[in-house]
Swiss-Prot record:
PANTHER family: HEAT SHOCK PROTEIN 70KDA
Record flagged with keyword Membrane: no
Domain of life assignment: Bacteria
Chain segments carrying region Disordered: 602-634
Sites bearing Phosphothreonine, chain numbering: T198
Gene: dnaK2
Protein name stated in the entry: Chaperone protein DnaK 2
Classification via PROSITE patterns: HSP70_1 (PS00297), HSP70_2 (PS00329), HSP70_3 (PS01036)
Alphabetically ordered keywords of this record: ATP-binding, Chaperone, Nucleotide-binding, Phosphoprotein, Stress response
InterPro entries: ATPase_NBD, Chaperone_DnaK, Heat_shock_70_CS, HSP70_C_sf, HSP70_peptide-bd_sf, Hsp_70_fam
Amino acid sequence: MGKIIGIDLGTTNSCVAVLDGDTPRVLENAEGERTTASVIAYTDGETLVGQPAKRQAVTNPQNTLFAIKRLIGRRFEDEEVQRDIEIMPFKIVKADNGDAWVEAKGQKMAAPQVSAEVLKKMKKTAEDFLGEEVTGAVVTVPAYFNDAQRQATKDAGRIAGLDVKRIINEPTAAALAYGLDKKGGDRTIAVYDLGGGTFDISIIEIDNVDGEQTFEVLATNGDTHLGGEDFDNRLINYLVSEFEKEQGINLKNDPLAMQRVKEAAEKAKIELSSAQQTDVNLPYVTADATGPKHMNVKVTRAKLESLVEDLVLRSLEPLKVALADADLSVDEITDVILVGGQTRMPMVQAKVAEFFGKEARRDVNPDEAVAMGAAVQGGVLAGDVKDVLLLDVTPLSFGIETMGGVMTKLIEKNTTIPTKADQTFSTAEDNQSAVTIHVLQGERKQATYNKSLGQFNLEGIQPAPRGMPQIEVTFDLDADGILNVSAKDKATGKEQKITIQASGGLTDEEIEAMVQEAEANKDADKKFEELVTARNQADQMIHGTQKQIEEAGDALPADEKEKIEAAIKALEEVKSGNDKEAIDAKTQELMQAAQKLMEIAQQKAQAQQGADAGEQPKQDDDVVDAEFEEVKDK
């Protein structure tokens, strides 16, 4: 097997590494840089990637694409994509399937197609170093990437001519790079990963047992639309606002000027990590009837911090959730590792140190650690590294919609992957010949508040009373975090399978808010559960009573039948509403009205027993009375 390279496909910068002996090595690209800007430019007949693309952006803003990772696996209608449309100089358009695509040189392109250009450059960089063709790669994604985004990343690899052997989470990769050369005792580390477009936190336990290192992810959380680009945008908006106050001109209508301001803001942000003040000086940034206009704005570190403080504080909320999910306190964290270029900002470092009560380690390169860890995992898959075991987790729960609009979870968040889970469900109506399996991802009890990943039908179910058919639903989550679902009718053996497609992925806003929403809406979820239970009990009561009316036949007096049917009608009128008390009250009224049915059923049963007592029971030597105990799989 050839070398399996490790690629960190970043929002702002990308990086490639290979295993050189036992040590991961970051490779320099054709321009001599260890990281490559994730910028792609389309010029007349040529596609530029990295620094060459960045250099010509000012004169070609509409055809220079950047931060494409923020669009990968996402829908055009998503609120965050709509916000990006307002600030991006290039066109974001709606694809036929509803995905967010981009347009350059009059051509519409999918996000994986554009990201593939960066992956091609990474592939070429590795091939130049190794002197041989490279086809296998481990590509990293934010830990909080959903099914659709992971699928889209694999698609980008395939378009770039790479066989993506494994998708791994960025914080986990960083932990691999950090822990590989540390053969000491067991440690629990927190990886805080604030990159160009995404934020992740992972709590990882590193164990050393008989010379083998186990990296086990205990919990992960994050925000897929929080990163350095958002910090840049705050500074860009400030500079544009200051210029408008001074000159009365809004630069947002001038793509060329905005590209220059973007570059200047990024440069100023970096400078303010080491300096207390910087000047943003852009001569001839625009012009009007009175002549050329120049931008000259002083920006202090304190000003930048005031502009972005809420973004930094927003990153602390997922830390609390991850620690709670791992059932750990901050005191139990051995080391804190910072990953991603935005963690170079002193304010970020200070807030993280304050949260954990300890300084982060300085021996991890925030730009290179992720690619190095991916190269280590490539070595594990190729068989070159034998004493490392990686146990990653799924960031969000998977389940299906069941009766009453409830999400029934089959795989809980923070479950180690790969994993498989199955559960048996049944029909909700008599003689139901088909069921719809609606697959969901998220943490809320109410199905509509989770994201629909897709649905499919299982048809050809044999007619039977409701609750009788046995439909086995199986969720198979692979090591890349990508889901396969199957449903099987146990009676007929008919089966239907689905691999969740990229067009059904979660939106970034939904993903970042799901776990926090679940925490904040516990009371609402509890009330909803109680309402659904009341509705289901009402349904069962109506169904059972109607069946008893049929069985009673002429034995049920007409006036009693009329009374019961009126109670059924009254219950049917309220059971679809949201008033639990009204549903409970009408259910009780139906139970009272149906007393006569119970008496008739008892009389029939007694009469039957009397008839049976007159007959001699048939002996059956093969029947043995036995007690049994149900043993559930752990």
